[in-house]
Amino acid sequence: MEEQQKELDGKWLQEGVQRMMVMLESDSRNESFARVCVASFMTRMNPTVAETDDVKTAVSEAVTNSIVHGYPYEKGLIRLVCAIEKDTLTVQIRDWGRGIENVKKAMEPMYSQSVRGPERSGM
């Protein structure tokens, strides 16, 4: 946790920036919770239904990716940070799970280093 705190120091309390942080266990049941948290936080921006749906989809995909690929064998932590500055929403999803061995190769179409088989691949 000390590493995580160092990442946030100096960035958290900035004038004119509203922030939210949630720590989640890497459990698939938390994917929907993360979506709802972000959707609730962004209501202060008065988004359209389509904008809210787009953000919820992106959060769902990112959290699911952290759960499936970051922690395939064990539970771990996922940090969700949201910030609103002026009219911009920033969402950061971070895990400390298994990394990507070859980032360059991972950018290739249909590449997967999945331990669960070929049913999932990056597009």
Predicted stretch roles:
Residues M21-S32:
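STAS-typified acidic loop motif
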Residues S32-S60:
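Conserved short strand/loop->alpha-helix "switch" segment adjacent to the catalytic nucleotide/phosphoryl-transfer site
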Residues S28-N30, D53, A106, G117:
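A generic structural micro-environment signature
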Residues M1-M21, S66-M123:
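Conserved beta-strand-loop-beta-strand hairpin that lines the nucleotide-binding pocket
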Residues A58-V68:
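Polybasic, low-complexity association/targeting segments
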